[in-house]
């Protein structure tokens, strides 16, 4: 197992992301978290959708920094099971949950624009920007987040296949400590720590977002086909921020 130096890393070394990622690839997920918390910019936070396998990163981060802010974007259209799952994990793991919501209510948005998620790619993109991207950008700015942890994994979709452990977005560093994990790795971690999948997992939901644009997985489908009618996988948070 490759070990990174314990001494502080200079900003110039931090800018050499290719070399840094090569070293991070040789570490376990918990070591990546520990390293990023020690060497990354101040004000770390974790974003979570409280989706199918979210308990992994919530546990991984809260074990090392119990008070780390956990950002949940409440679009107003999450499954009831997601809200209950968030409540249960927040209580069990004693999470420092920070809930951010869109500036416009569901009713007002629909009065202005109709059901945007039914209006093709243009409508879906507008919906995602209003209800997901803007609140997340606001959360990261208000919390002055310098090190942003995510639960992105390469095996989740073709668009995420090249996800690095660390990337730079503006002045912010984005860390995906389980980027190289498979579904089996996730299952083993959940089993080892007696952590649950999202309640809808057992009903065939493998990627869980808003109730109107999430469908059960069926044989022959890719995971990304279960979101946004198969038109796209990403909501924009991990593309535009």
UniProtKB/Swiss-Prot annotation:
<keyword id="KW-0963">Cytoplasm</keyword>
<dbReference type="InterPro" id="IPR002500">
    <property type="entry name" value="PAPS_reduct_dom"/>
</dbReference>
<comment type="pathway">
    <text>Sulfur metabolism; hydrogen sulfide biosynthesis; sulfite from sulfate: step 3/3.</text>
</comment>
<dbReference type="GO" id="GO:0005737">
    <property type="term" value="C:cytoplasm"/>
</dbReference>
<feature type="active site" description="Nucleophile; cysteine thiosulfonate intermediate">
    <location>
        <position position="235"/>
    </location>
</feature>
<dbReference type="InterPro" id="IPR011800">
    <property type="entry name" value="PAPS_reductase_CysH"/>
</dbReference>
<dbReference type="InterPro" id="IPR004511">
    <property type="entry name" value="PAPS/APS_Rdtase"/>
</dbReference>
<protein>
    <recommendedName>
        <fullName>Phosphoadenosine 5'-phosphosulfate reductase</fullName>
        <ecNumber>1.8.4.8</ecNumber>
    </recommendedName>
</protein>
<dbReference type="InterPro" id="IPR014729">
    <property type="entry name" value="Rossmann-like_a/b/a_fold"/>
</dbReference>
<dbReference type="GO" id="GO:0019379">
    <property type="term" value="P:sulfate assimilation, phosphoadenylyl sulfate reduction by phosphoadenylyl-sulfate reductase (thioredoxin)"/>
</dbReference>
<keyword id="KW-0560">Oxidoreductase</keyword>
<comment type="similarity">
    <text>Belongs to the PAPS reductase family. CysH subfamily.</text>
</comment>
<dbReference type="GO" id="GO:0070814">
    <property type="term" value="P:hydrogen sulfide biosynthetic process"/>
</dbReference>
<comment type="function">
    <text>Catalyzes the formation of sulfite from phosphoadenosine 5'-phosphosulfate (PAPS) using thioredoxin as an electron donor.</text>
</comment>
<dbReference type="GO" id="GO:0004604">
    <property type="term" value="F:phosphoadenylyl-sulfate reductase (thioredoxin) activity"/>
</dbReference>
<dbReference type="Pfam" id="PF01507">
    <property type="entry name" value="PAPS_reduct"/>
</dbReference>
């Amino acid at each position: 197992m490759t070990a990174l130096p314990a001494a502080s890393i200079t900003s110039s070394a931090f800018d050499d992301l290719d070399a840094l990622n090569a070293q991070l690839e040789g570490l376990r997920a918990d070591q990546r978290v520990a390293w990023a918390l020690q060497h990354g910019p101040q004000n770390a936070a974790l974003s979570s959708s409280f989706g199918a396998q979210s308990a992994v990163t919530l546990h991984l981060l809260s074990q090392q920094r119990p008070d780390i802010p956990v950002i949940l974007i409440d679009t107003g259209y999450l499954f009831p099971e997601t809200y209950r799952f968030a409540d249960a994990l927040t209580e069990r793991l004693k999470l420092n949950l920070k809930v951010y919501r869109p500036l416009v209510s569901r009713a007002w948005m629909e009065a202005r624009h109709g059901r945007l998620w039914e209006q093709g790619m243009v409508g879906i993109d507008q919906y995602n920007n209003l209800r997901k991207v803007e609140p997340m950008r606001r959360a990261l700015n208000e919390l002055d987040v310098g090190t942003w942890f995510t639960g992105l994994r390469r095996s989740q979709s073709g668009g995420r296949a090249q996800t690095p452990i660390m990337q730079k977005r503006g002045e912010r560093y984005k860390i995906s400590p389980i980027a190289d994990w498979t579904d089996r790795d996730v299952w083993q971690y959940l089993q080892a720590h007696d952590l649950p999948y999202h309640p809808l997992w057992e009903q065939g939901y493998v990627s869980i977002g808003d109730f109107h644009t999430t469908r059960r997985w069926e044989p022959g489908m890719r995971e990304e086909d279960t979101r946004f009618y198969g038109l796209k996988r990403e909501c924009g948070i991990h593309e535009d921020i």
